[in-house]
Design a protein with these regions (language model features):
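Conserved phosphate-binding catalytic cores of ATP/NTP-utilizing and phosphoryl-transfer enzymes
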Residues: 64-115
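Predominant activation on well-ordered alpha-helical scaffold segments within soluble catalytic domains
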Residues: 41-45, 65, 69, 81-88, ...
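N-terminal glycine/serine-rich phosphate-binding loop of ATP-dependent small-molecule kinases
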Residues: 1-80
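Hydrophobic alpha-helical scaffolding
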Residues: 30, 73, 77, 119-123, ...
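Short, acidic/turn-prone active-site loops that include or flank metal/cofactor-
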Residues: 30-34, 80-86, 120-128
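Glycine-rich phosphate-binding loop plus the immediately following alpha-helix
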Residues: 112-149, 153
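Short, intrinsically disordered, charge-balanced linker/junction segments flanking boundaries
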Residues: 152-162
């Protein structure tokens, strides 16, 4: 049996297909440029060879997940819960996890019980902000990482809207 996870965020669609031993047999990450249905069709179409005619389970998460859940008739899993389950399964020694989405940021503390926090929908300090900075610097996310690795000064940036 294969397990398909679909993450529909504010800027991207991600898919992972896992086998029964939790090995990734297919994965894809694609920007949707506000054409979510087309992008979902593309990422699902891309995994058809992998799926073949095997039995599958499917679930969707992310900020766009509820509407996709209704559209496709598949279960929805809240994104912080989905992320916490993935962390506990794949990297159980993790103490703290931080996830920067396109319009929000989430932090999960895993030691001494689970505590989760998430900011309101806002691009300040999130992936959309980082994308904008990359564009202004005429690079991409990988380029931002390369530029940052030799830093000499840390500059404060706003981490909230307004």
């Amino acid at each position: 049996m294969l397990h398909i996870g679909l993450d529909v965020g504010s800027t991207t669609v991600k898919i992972a297909v896992l086998d029964d031993e939790n090995n990734a047999v297919y994965k894809n990450y694609q920007r949707h440029y506000s054409d979510i249905k087309k992008t979902i069709a593309e990422v699902l179409g891309g995994c058809l060879e992998t799926i073949d005619e095997k039995n599958v389970t499917v679930a969707v998460t992310g900020s766009g997940g509820i509407s996709v859940s209704h559209w496709l008739g598949i279960p929805f899993v809240q994104e912080v819960s989905a992320g916490t389950t993935a962390i506990q399964t794949f990297i159980p020694q993790t103490d703290v996890a931080i996830e920067l989405g396109g319009e929000d940021a989430k932090i999960t503390y895993l030691t001494g019980g689970i505590e989760q926090r998430m900011n309101g929908s806002c691009a300040g300090g999130t992936g959309a902000f980082i994308d904008q900075m990359a564009s202004l610097l005429n690079t991409d996310i990988t380029g931002i990482n390369e530029l940052a690795k030799d830093y000499t000064t840390i500059y404060p940036i706003a981490s909230r809207c307004g």
